[in-house]
Amino acid sequence: EAFNIGTQTSDYPGLGLSEAVYQPNVWPAAEGERVPEGMKQFRANLERWFHAAAQTARTLTGVFEHALNVPEGTITALASHSVDVLRCINYVLPPGTSAKVDDEQMGMGEHTDYGIVTILWADRVAGLQVLGTEGQWHDVVPEPGALLVNLGDVMARLTNDQWLSTLHRVKPPVENGVIRRRRAAAFFHDGNEDAVVHPLPGMVDASHPPLYKPLTIGEHLLAKLGGSKGLQINNRDTEREAARVLASART
C-alpha cells in the first residue's frame, strides 16, 4: 500500500503553475468532515516530514554545486518551485495471508529515479539493492538514524553522465520463507517543470561531447512517465537511460 503527497499550486501562488503537474493533495478526510485525531496527527507528521526532506534536498544541491565547482545557485535555481513528491510505502501482506516468492520475483524492478535527487528513509530490513560500478547488485540496509540518497536522471543530464543516476531495485524481504514487513518513505526532488536541463559549465569539452539534448524537466518527466506506463521509449532522448536499466536487468 502507498500514500503520496506533493508540491501544489497553492505552495507558489502567483506563478501560474499547472494544476495538472502541481496537483492538490488528497487526504483521507475531506475539508469540513469530522477528522479522527489520529488522522490529524498523520497529516501533520507527513507535512512536517515533507518540508524537512525538501530542506535536506536543497542543502544537498548546494553541496553538489560545491563538489562540481559550479557557481552557487546553478542547480538550486532549477528547483525554486520544484515538483516534489513524498511517497510512503508499506510492503506488507494482509493479516492471515501468506505468499511464496522465488528468487527472481521483484517488489519493484530495476529503475532509476527521474529527478535531481531522492531522499529515502527505510526500515532496516533487506530488500533495497543498488547496482555497483562493477555490475553487481548490493543489498543496502541503512544505518540506524541514517537516510539514503539516490541521484536521479536530471543530475546525470546536468553532469553529462559524470555523475550517473542510481540504478536500484527492491526484492521482497523474505526471512525463513516468510515475507517481512518493510516500510519506506521516498522524497523525490525533481526540479521546476519549466526549467531547461543542459550540461553544467565544465561538463562538456573535446573529450566529453554532449550526451543529451536540452529539454525541460516537464518534458523529461512526461517522457519517463509515459514510457513506464506504456512500456515503451516515447522520447528518443531517454534511450541512453533506458539502455542502462535494460542492461542491469540482465545481471
What is each stretch, according to the model?
Residues E1-T251:
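Peripheral, non-catalytic segments flanking oxidoreductase cores
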